[in-house]
Amino acid sequence: MLASLLNITKVTELRNKVVYTLLMFIVFRLGIHIPVPGVEASVIESLFTSGNLFGLLDLFAGGALSKFSIFAMSITPYINASIIMQLLGAVVPTFEAWSKDGEEGRKKIAKVTRYGTVVLGFIQAFGMTYALRASNALIDNSFMSVILISIILTAGTCLLMWIGEQITAHGIGNGISLIIFAGIVARFPDGVHTIYQYLQVGTINVFQAILFAIIAVAMIVLVIAVTQGQRRIPIQYAKRVVGRKMYGGHSTFLPLKVNQAGVIPIIFASSILMFPATLAQFVQVPWVQTVASYFQWGTPIQTILYAVLILFFTYFYTAISINITDMADNMKKHGGFIPGIRPGKPTADYVDRVMTRITLVGAFFLAFVAILPNMIGGLTGIQGVYFGGTALLIVVGVALDTMQQVESLVLTRQYKGFVK
C-alpha cells in the first residue's frame, strides 16, 4: 500500500489532481469559518445542545450549520435538485430524452439542476432564516434582513456547487461527494473529543467507551461489506460468424449491487420527517405543536416511520434507476442470455425477482444504518456524537469510489495500484 501511495507522486497528472483537490478543500474549510452577518451566535449554538436532527445536518455541513457560516446549508439543495431531476427523468419525456442524449443531454440536465439548486437553496435559506427570526436569533428582525441572509446562504451553496464541479473537472473523484466526505471527516475529531470529555466528567465509564469503539469498528466492516456486496448473474454470449471470423462465445456477469440506492432513501425519508418540525416553526397552533412533538428526532413514532419510509424509498429509487426491461432487450440484441433463462421477457422477470430479493437486504440495512445513532446512544449512553451509519456509508462509499478512480489512473501508467 505504501508503495502504491508513493507512485502517486510519480504520476504528474495524478499529483496535480490531488493538489488541486486539496486546495479546493482548503477553500471549503475556510468558508466554514466565515459567519453570516446579523445572527446571534449564542442562540444558534443552543439549537445543537440537545442532540437532535440539527446535529446530523451539521455533521453533513462539516460544522458550518452550528457556526451558521456562509456554507451553513452545505450542498444539500444541489443534492435535492439532482434527486428531483432523476425522478423527473423517469416520468417526463423531455428529461428522459436528455438522459439518453449523451454529452449534450448531460449538459442540459446539469444546467437545469443548477437553476433548481438556486431555487431550492433560496427556499430552504428563507425558511431557515425565518425560523431563526421566530427564535430571536437575528440581530435585525426586519423582513429585508431575512431576505439578505437568505441571499448570502444561497450564494454560499452556489459557491460550494461550483467548487464541487471544479473538483470533478480538474481534481480527483466526484466533487460534490468529496465535499460531503470532507465535512463528515472534519467532524470526527470533535466526536472523539466529546467522548473524552464524557469520560473526564464521569458521564460514561471506560466500558461504555470501549463498547462504542467496538460498535464503530463493526459498523465500518459492515458498511464496507454491504457497499461492495453484489449478486453476479452469469451471462453467456452466443457465437456469431461474420464473414470468416467468429465473434462472441465468451462469458461475463451482470453485477447487481445489494445497496443500489445508496444513501438517497435516507435523504428522502429525512426530508419528509423534517416537515412537521419545520411547519411547527411557522404555525404556532397548539394541535400543530402537539403533532410535531411526536415527530421529534428519536421518538418511537419517528423512528418507526423513518424505517418504513426508508424501506419504501429504497425499492422506489431502485425501480426508477434500473430499467430492467431495457437491460434484457439490450442483452438479447447483442446475443447475450442467462443460462437456463430464455431471452427477452423471461430474462427481465428473472432479473426483477433477484433484484427484489437483494434490495430487501439493502433496504433493511439502510433502515438499520439510519436508526443506529439512537441505538448507540441507548447502549453506550453517548449522546450528541453523530458517529452514525449514514455518515459511515457516505465516507466509505466516497473513499472506495475515489480509490477506484486513482487505481485506474495509476494502472494506465503501468503502476501497481491500490486494489488487489
Spans of features found by a protein language model:
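N-terminal cationic and glycine-rich segments that engage phosphates or anionic surfaces
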Residues: 1-99, 104-420
